[in-house]
Amino acid sequence: MKYELDKTSGNARRGRLVFERPQGTFSVETPAFMPVGTYGTVKGMTPEEVRATGAEILLGNTFHLWLRPGQEIMRKHGDLHDFMQWHRPILTDSGGFQVFSLGKLRKITEEGVKFQNPINGERIFLSPEKSMEIQYDLGSDIVMIFDECTPYPATFDYAKKSMEMSLRWAKRSRARFDELGNKNALFGIIQGGVFEELRKVSLEGLVNIGFDGYAVGGLAVGEPKEDMHRILEYICPQIPADKPRYLMGVGKPEDLVEGVRRGIDMFDCVMPTRNARNGHLFVTDGIVKIRNAKYRDDTSPLDPECDCYTCKNYTKAYLYHLDKCGEILGARLNTIHNLRYYQRLMAEIRQAIEDDRFDDFVVEFYARMGKPVPPLQLADKS
């Protein structure tokens, strides 16, 4: 993987990730949003439909794909690309976040994490080395190191110990990744909770090890938005400029805009797909809750400015009807729209950076939403 930085507008960055795959060269234009395909599928969508929304890269979930279908079945197909028939780039998380979300079902040690399989109850063990092996079998184009996602709230001492262990796990992840002869990309994950000095130590340690990109982890885990913004404003300028920056598990449309304002290049989140299945649809001027009775006889399209299959062909009344009847097509049409909304948003962001009018775009974006622009505490780097 290569990262090419074309242009900046303030702290916002316009570039691309370039991947050499057996099927050819693939570019992922950045800033980019990655739809989440937890179990090897973006829920309800074929790969062709996901691609039609504008997606150029997907996220797969190492933890869930390890438990089902498992490494052996994955190897029999070739890798995850062959299994799910998505032959463009795939990023896989390390499994760390899912393991740590198990709470009392898991026990963390220096070696790794012992936990109870949520599917069948058996006790299993995941380590940095095992995570690298699973992701190697998945054929991930971007592999994430195994780390501990520091919870919120956490004391300074806990966040420090957690971050230091994640750094030791980062070294082990790097070593096993290299032993496997993996030629794809490996990203480090910056931890440290809401404490700036810990984030700095984490980043410096990761840079010393050396990675192809750097993710900001341990945010969007319940902390106030102000803390997320503060940490991003503090740490992003310190990440090597020639490496991509990935904000994990984020988020709402405004979170993407705020991340880009602070120098982030990559995002992922289940929000557009999960919200779609619950009738919560993103449109140019905010949100449409399609289950609201006022849409029962609304013959207008969901979003007149959207060019997705759903908006070009169906009315709000039809989407309301499908939802009320519990029809699968309703969830699918909603998902197509929400994914397209996110990709259109990213395309608009990229164009605004290219045109050096990103600040104006931010003002217009919030004006359409009827919201004030959140303050940016750091002086823009021009």
Swiss-Prot record:
Domain of life: Bacteria
Binding site for substrate: D93, S94, G95, G96, F97, D147, Q191, G218
Binding positions (Zn(2+)): C306, C308, C311, H337
Record field: catalytic activity: 7-aminomethyl-7-carbaguanine + guanosine(34) in tRNA = 7-aminomethyl-7-carbaguanosine(34) in tRNA + guanine
Record key words, sorted: Glycosyltransferase, Metal-binding, Queuosine biosynthesis, Transferase, tRNA processing, Zinc
Cofactor(s) needed by this chain: Zn(2+)
Entry keyword annotation includes Nucleotide-binding: no
Active site positions, chain numbering: D93, D268
Cofactor, free-text remark: Binds 1 zinc ion per subunit.
GO molecular function: metal ion binding; tRNA-guanosine(34) queuine transglycosylase activity
Region described as RNA binding: spans on this chain: 249-255, 273-277
BP term (GO), one: queuosine biosynthetic process
Enzyme nomenclature, EC number: 2.4.2.29
Functional pathway: tRNA modification; tRNA-queuosine biosynthesis
Record's GO cellular component terms: cytosol
Keyword Transferase attributed: yes
Quaternary structure (record): Homodimer. Within each dimer, one monomer is responsible for RNA recognition and catalysis, while the other monomer binds to the replacement base PreQ1.
Family of this protein: Belongs to the queuine tRNA-ribosyltransferase family.
Function summary: Catalyzes the base-exchange of a guanine (G) residue with the queuine precursor 7-aminomethyl-7-deazaguanine (PreQ1) at position 34 (anticodon wobble position) in tRNAs with GU(N) anticodons (tRNA-Asp, -Asn, -His and -Tyr). Catalysis occurs through a double-displacement mechanism. The nucleophile active site attacks the C1' of nucleotide 34 to detach the guanine base from the RNA, forming a covalent enzyme-RNA intermediate. The proton acceptor active site deprotonates the incoming PreQ1, allowing a nucleophilic attack on the C1' of the ribose to form the product.
Name of the protein described by the UniProt record: Queuine tRNA-ribosyltransferase
Native source organism of the sequence: Haemophilus influenzae (strain PittGG)
Gene field: tgt
